[in-house]
């Protein structure tokens, strides 16, 4: 049985006992036994471990983990300190500087965001090395759909930041009118100039949180 160590354990108890997660678990046993996969099996649920269900102020939804060695550690778009900053995160930092004047960090670790209530969730939580989206059909999509549905039930407002088509596909589960959705193109170099740059997601998130009486996010990572 998975143990997150906070209120997600109770919130997701039915999901972890359900047929879909049992199927995921069997798939991962085989994948991690026979292939190099990321993140480490101990980091798969880091997004939930770092950000308790009742602490979530904002959700930044990614696609699947980085698939090269040393990058993924269970938080969407984040890499551990000392790892080269990936292109999508470089663009996120550029938009952060344009939006709020915060200079790009010298590292790519976003744990500071997660500890403040920013759920850095990927739609798919694992990947085989060097093969992007290789675990997309193992059941993770349904599992993270269920997470979004649980967050939608919250009676405290949340900002959902959806970058790119994959993330925007989950908008259908955000039906509670108290929440706020920010959507744009993905920050990857292939699409960032199609609407990500200039979308001001960070200031818009904080403006909404302040209007709801919620402490804004300090978007610095240093």
Positions of PLM-derived features:
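A polyanion-binding, active-site-adjacent surface
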Residues: 2, 14-162, 166-169, 174, ...
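A non-catalytic structural micro-motif
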Residues: 194-196
């Amino acid at each position: 049985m998975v143990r997150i160590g906070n209120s997600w354990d109770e919130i997701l108890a039915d999901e972890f006992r359900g047929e879909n997660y049992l199927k995921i678990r069997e798939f991962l046993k085989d994948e991690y036994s026979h292939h190099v996969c990321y993140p480490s099996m101990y980091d798969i649920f880091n997004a939930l471990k770092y950000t308790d269900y009742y602490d979530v102020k904002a959700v930044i939804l990614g696609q699947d983990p980085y698939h090269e060695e040393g990058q993924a550690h269970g938080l969407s778009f984040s890499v551990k300190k000392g790892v080269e900053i990936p292109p999508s995160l470089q663009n996120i930092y550029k938009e952060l500087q344009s939006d709020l004047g915060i200079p790009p960090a010298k590292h790519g670790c976003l744990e500071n965001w997660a500890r403040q209530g920013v759920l850095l969730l990927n739609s798919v939580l694992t990947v085989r090395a060097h093969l992007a989206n290789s675990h997309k059909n193992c059941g993770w999509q349904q599992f993270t759909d269920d997470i979004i549905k649980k967050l939608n039930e919250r009676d405290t407002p949340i900002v959902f930041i959806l970058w790119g088509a994959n993330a925007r596909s989950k908008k259908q589960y955000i039906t509670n009118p108290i929440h706020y959705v920010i959507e744009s193109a993905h920050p990857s170099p292939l699409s960032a100039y199609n609407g990500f740059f200039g979308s001001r997601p960070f200031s818009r998130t904080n403006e909404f949180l302040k209007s709801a009486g919620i402490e804004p996010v300090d978007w610095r990572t240093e």
